[in-house]
Amino acid sequence: VILDVRHQDDFSKGHIPQSIFIGIDGDFAPWVGSLILDIKQPILLVTPVGREEESITRLARVGYDNTLGYLKGGFESWKNEGKEYDTVNWVTADTLEELMAEKVPVFDVRKEGEYAAEHIEGVPSTPLNSINDHIEEFPKEEEFYVHCAGGYRSVIAASILKARGYHNIINAIGGFTSIKKTAIKTTNYVCPSTLKS
């Protein structure tokens, strides 16, 4: 697997096709453990320049010690050599608000507890940690939109779905935090401590 650990904005602007994003400056270890199930999985890294060794060490600390190497010179060297690269399309929360009037498909990849506390009305819960169980729910042809709380997990979801051939995915940047500032209808907030587990 090609694992890209740069910032989600950098990954969105350009990445090696079929690479998976899990940013080193987010909840890196938990998401690696959750999404790369085989700890013996060979890994090729794309890192921010100068953070190659840190990335290898942090993977090894959680048991992933089969890192084959990293892209020398980072993603820019790949791009500068004229090699093919992919991007993640995105919209702002304000644009999503306009699109919601057209009943576009939107998916919430936050944890079930976050979704239960508050979510966009009519939008299904497809949590990132079980995204493989929801693959069939995503449209094959029609453009669809994903969001999380702030924009990190939705890019992970986009990378997984793009690697599986879903190039019609669009990320809502800023996530639910930005969506809350629009007129998009959300459910009434329920304090997570009052939710039954």
Segments from the language model and where they lie:
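Phosphate-rich cofactor/ligand-interacting catalytic cores and adjacent structured alpha/beta frameworks
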Residues: 4
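Rhodanese-like catalytic fold shared by cysteine-dependent sulfurtransferases
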Residues: 8-197
